[in-house]
From Swiss-Prot:
Catalytic activities: 3-phosphoshikimate + phosphoenolpyruvate = 5-O-(1-carboxyvinyl)-3-phosphoshikimate + phosphate
Single GO BP term: amino acid biosynthetic process
Subcellular location: Cytoplasm
Protein name as catalogued: 3-phosphoshikimate 1-carboxyvinyltransferase
Active site: 304
Amino acid sequence: MIVSVSRSSISGTVCAPPSKSYTHRAVLITALSDSGCVHRPLISADTRATISACDAFGADVKLRGDSLEIQGVSGAPRTPENVIDVLNSGTTLRFMSAVAALTDGAVLTGDSSIRSRPNGPLLKALNELGAEAFSIRGNDRAPLVIRGRLRGGSTSLDGSVSSQFLSALLIACPLSSGETTISIKGELKSRPYAEMTLDILRKAGAEICTDGDIFRMRGGQSYRLAEYTVPGDFSSASYPLAAAALAGSATVEGLFPSRQGDSAIVDILREMGAEVSWDMESGEVRVSGADLRGREIDASQTPDLVPTLAVLGAVAEGRTVIKNAEHVRHKETDRIHAMAVELKKMGANIRERPDGLEIDGGDLHGADLHGYHDHRIVMALTLAGIVAGDTRIDTAESVDVSYPGFFEDMRRLGANVRAST
């Protein structure tokens, strides 16, 4: 699908979609318990992959109205009968690889993007904790073969690639037969996502002790998550909020305080010069545009914001430096390189750094852009098109991964966005 974007003025109110990250975790942890209900889940391509994988491991997940009713496996997932295809969901691949180590074995694969993403730290850890885990191609990429069973022990993880490896082990290891200790080497990138995992696990009754970058948990535990309501997604909300800062004003509802690191978008927009108010009790964030100013941004804990921040920096007065984001090169695509290439087509003065981007703000012009089959690239480039006008972006269907209603919400806010096949 190709989306055409014209210069637009933004105004109005939309509701933040449910959090993709919380939905993944709540669905899986409930599926590993006896039974429960996840209210207001995000139903998207990625979360459907997790739901399908949970079914493959023996759970029964049914959508009833605005809730998922889940009959779980009581801590004993079944050995899947077929290969698990995670489609484009890296979260599903990493989480389900750890769950597979609680069974007799499973094979996991995904699309071409998934088959290019590294999993070495997770495979190493699973092997050290008693499972047998390897890449069929011998390159740490999917397809992956995982054979159980986890028995506990000690392992370490390189924290510089993805916190998903840690989250996967935190979910699976309390269900193993022995005590597990996990140590993080180096800086843990995207730490808020690991904290999100711990938050839901503890709500489900898991006992996990943390001491800085060391995580300890006994084996033989069980989960109970009878009900869980998914909060609004700050990662997705960053797009309408940034659109308002760039081209008007808008209110996004459903944004309450949580463990989401991407709530940093509120402070970033304010520091760049936008008028921002957040009523934490009502969950409403209102942004009014202004002349934005460039600034230095540490993206180590907010990797999903990087494409949006690149667009803001391309328009803001002065220089914007996005740093400590080298792990963003290992997402659906190399998002640092992709944003540099595409914004240059629009006239941006942008340079790649090993760990991020350096951007001198200015005027953008319309262009034909490549979306890289990456939902966050497509949504960020749509924001650039709202400012520049006369812009076309391909592979726009990829927004279904995390924000199926993105283009509808943008039109609701006044964006002139038209889709064609």
